[in-house]
A protein has these predicted regions:
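Second-shell loop/turn segments in exported
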Residues: 60-68, 103-104
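Hydrophobic/aromatic-rich, well-ordered segments within soluble, folded domains that form packed cores
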Residues: 67-68, 73-75, 114-117, 195-205
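All-alpha RGS (Regulator of G-protein Signaling) helical domain and cognate RGS-like helical scaffolds
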Residues: 37-43, 70-73, 80-178
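An amphipathic alpha-helical core segment
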Residues: 155-211, 215-226
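Low-complexity, Gly/Ser/Thr/Pro-rich intrinsically disordered linker/tail segments
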Residues: 226-227, 231-239
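N-terminal secretory signal peptides and thylakoid transit peptides that target proteins
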Residues: 1-18
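Acidic/His metal-coordination segments adjacent to aromatic residues that form catalytic metal sites
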Residues: 54-57, 96-101, 182-185
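C-terminal segment of N-terminal export signals and the immediately downstream linker at the start
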Residues: 25-58
């Protein structure tokens, strides 16, 4: 049975398709790839899940598989399509609205791919953080309990809408911060995310319907702290 695509994916696909049709009808002087230097071919492939989707308490295999196959992998496919269209376009001669539309969708698809990979890497864990990350969370939020409360509350505040909650390292301030993002293009400038919570409806509606808060609670019980710890230590060393 076909799976209904979320509005964000439908809109993105429609935009890419419209740009492709428009690019195909441009005058030859605008559409010729040879009019500008050739672009190296780039092909993105979905990153394999690092866990068994049938073994994540509170999140069903059906939900996680649909999320991975349709939303994450769909973003990868969309990014490949946009990249190919840009490579074939004489960007110096193309109308500005064509370039603007393709570059906007390229950013959305690229960030969707990258943040989804962090989201899946953030799952299938449990327990509590340890070591330098635990110390930093206590230092920057007052306590681990306070961080949990703020992170979960931010996710629940997005329930019924869409977006992301990211725990990010700020190289500027040398501290951890929870950031709110209404779409794939809103992130902390210079921030390095180490943990991602997907609050788009496709991440929970199949299991929880409108009960977004219950999904957030399930996520909080499944955080893979070893992944967050490794990212935190790497980014902290770099700054």
């Amino acid at each position: 049975m076909a799976t209904k695509l979320p509005r964000r994916d439908v809109m993105g696909t429609a935009t890419v398709a419209a740009a492709a049709v428009l690019a195909a009808t441009l005058p030859p002087r605008m559409a010729r790839a040879q009019a500008t230097p050739p672009v190296p071919k780039v092909e993105y492939t979905p990153k394999k899940l690092a866990f068994d989707p049938a073994k994540v308490p509170g999140l069903s295999e059906k939900l996680l598989t649909s999320h991975y196959d349709n939303n994450y992998s769909g973003a990868v496919r969309r990014l490949n399509a946009i990249t190919a269209q840009l490579a074939a376009l004489d960007v110096a001669a193309a109308p500005v609205f064509v370039v603007n539309g393709l570059k906007r969708e390229e950013l959305i698809a690229a960030n969707s791919m990258i943040i989804h990979e962090l989201y899946f890497d953030s799952l299938a864990g449990g327990g509590e953080p340890s070591g330098a990350l635990a110390e930093a969370l206590t230092r920057d939020f007052g306590s681990l309990a306070r961080w949990k409360a703020e992170f979960a509350a931010t996710g629940k505040a997005l329930g019924g809408g869409s977006g992301w909650v990211l725990l990010s390292w700020s190289p500027r301030d040398k501290r951890l911060i929870n950031t709110w993002a209404a779409d794939h293009t809103m992130t902390l400038a210079g921030g390095r995310p180490i943990l991602a919570l997907d609050m788009y409806e496709h991440a929970y509606q199949m299991d929880y319907g409108a009960r977004a808060a219950a999904y957030v609670d399930a996520f909080m019980q499944n955080i893979r702290w070893t992944n967050a710890q490794a990212l935190f230590e790497r980014y902290a060393r770099e700054t």
